[in-house]
Amino acid sequence: MHEKTIAELSAALTKGECSSVELTEHFLKRIEALDGGLNSFVTVTAEQALAQAKAADDRRARGEAGPLTGVPMAQKDIFCTDGVRTTCGSKMLDNFIAPYDATVVERFKAEGCPMLGKTNMDEFAMGSSNETSFHGPVKNPWDTARVPGGSSGGSAAAVAARLTPSATGTDTGGSIRQPAALCGITGLKPTYGRVSRWGMIAFASSLDQGGPMAATAEDCALLANVMSGFDPRDSTSIERPAEDFTARLNEPLKGLRIGLPREFFGEGLDAGVAKAVDEAIEQYKQLGAEVKEVGLPNSGLSVPAYYVVAPAECSSNLARFDGVRYGYRCENPKDLMDLYTRSRGEGFGAEVKRRIMVGTYALSAGYFDAYYLKAQKIRRLIADDFARAFEEVDVILGPTSPSTAFRLGEKTDDPVTMYLSDIYTIAVNLAGLPGMSIPAGFSDGLPVGLQLIGNYFDEARLLGVAHQYQSVTDWHRRIPKGFE
C-alpha cells in the first residue's frame, strides 16, 4: 500500500479495494516500526487518526467523499493543531497545545484526511539540515549518516521513507524544495499568498508559504487543491477564484520555453548534481520543450539580502515568546526583566538566537537604511530579473541544491556554508514566485533535485511540466533501501 501514490490510494478507496482505517493502520505500523532510526515524527496521533479514518469510511459509504477523503497525511509541526502539541521544533513551545486549528489543518480535516501526526523540523523553521530541532536531528532515509535538508526535514524524510503518503511543509528560503531534493521526493512552494498562513507559526511573514510534499507532482496538485484558497483571517492571502491544479497535468510540452539561468550552473555546483540536471534537460528536449539560456544577474545577492530580511522579520515575530502568556517560562524569575531574559535565553536554540540578534541589529535606528532598506531594494531587483526572464520563457529550470545530502554535523559549525545550501531557492521566496523540486536521479546513491520555477500563479503549468517528466522517468518511484 505504501508504494502507491495518493492518486492511486484515492482510486483504491473509491473502488473499495481498501478502507481508510486499513490504510491508516498500515502507515501507523510503518511509523512505529521504522521511524526510530529517522526521528521524522515529533508526535504520532494514532487514536485521532483512526477515529478520523473511521469517519472518512462512513462518509464514503454515504457517497460524500472528496478526492482525498480517507487518505492519511502528516502535518509539519509549525501548523497549529487543536488539542495536539505544536512545538515548532523548539524548547520554547515544547509543551504548547494549540487551542485551534490552522487554516491548512482545517482544510485537510474538512476533506476527511486522517492526520498521522506532526513532523520534526528545524527550530522555528530556521535551518537547512533539520539539526536545529529541540527534538534532535532527522536522518535522511537514503543514508542515515546524512541530513534530510530543512527546515521541513521531518516531512521530507517521512514521505521518502513512505511513512506517510504526504506531508505539509513550509518554505521561507527553500524549506520545502531543498529537503524534497535531498530526500528524493516532490515538493511545491506555491506563489506567496496562495496558501493561508493563519495558524502557521510565523518566521518571516513576507516570505513564509505553506505547500505540499509527496511522491509525485500529481499528488502535489491534489494536495494543493485542498490547501490553497483565500482566507480572510490572513491579511496576505490572495483573493482569486478557486483553481484546479490538476487541470494541466496532461498538457504536452511541445513549444514550452524553458529558461536555464547561467547563474545556477556555475562555480559551486557539484559535478554529480550538474550531470543529473543536464540529463533532465535532455529529457525535456525529447518531450518537445525548447531550451534557452536566461540571465538572473542579481540572484547572487539573494543569500545576503535574505539574511537581512528574514532575521529582521523573525526578530519581530519571535518577540511574542517572552515567558508570560504561553511557551517556556524560566523558574523563579527575580523580576520581569529576568523573566524575559532567562525565558528567551533558555527557550531558544543557538541558530534562532543568532537570527534574532542579526535581525534586531538590522532594524536598529543607526543601521536600518544600511541593511534592511538596502536588502529590500535588492529584493525588488531580483523580482525584476525574474520578470524579464519570464518575458522570454515559460518556466525556469535548474538544480534545487548545489549538492546532494551532506553529513550530519558537517556544516553545523559554519552558518555561512549552511546558508549557501539554499543559494538556488532563496531568490524565489524574495520574489514571491512559485517553485518546486522534483526527483531527477542520483549521484553516488543520493537523490538529486531538479528545481522548476514559474511565474506568479502559474502552479498548474509547473505541476504539468513536472508531471510530464515523471511520466517518462521513474525517479519518483524509488524507495530507500530498508523502507521498501
From Swiss-Prot:
One of its GO terms (biological process) is translation. The active site is at K76 (charge relay system), S151 (charge relay system), S175 (acyl-ester intermediate). It is an enzyme of class 6 (ligase). It catalyses: L-glutamyl-tRNA(Gln) + L-glutamine + ATP + H2O = L-glutaminyl-tRNA(Gln) + L-glutamate + ADP + phosphate + H(+). Disulfide bonds: none annotated. Pfam families: Amidase. Its EC number is 6.3.5.7. One of its GO terms (cellular component) is glutamyl-tRNA(Gln) amidotransferase complex. It comes from the Bacteria. One of its GO terms (molecular function) is ATP binding. Keywords: ATP-binding, Ligase, Nucleotide-binding, Protein biosynthesis. Heterotrimer of A, B and C subunits. Allows the formation of correctly charged Gln-tRNA(Gln) through the transamidation of misacylated Glu-tRNA(Gln) in organisms which lack glutaminyl-tRNA synthetase. The reaction takes place in the presence of glutamine and ATP through an activated gamma-phospho-Glu-tRNA(Gln). Belongs to the amidase family. GatA subfamily. This is Glutamyl-tRNA(Gln) amidotransferase subunit A. The gene is gatA.
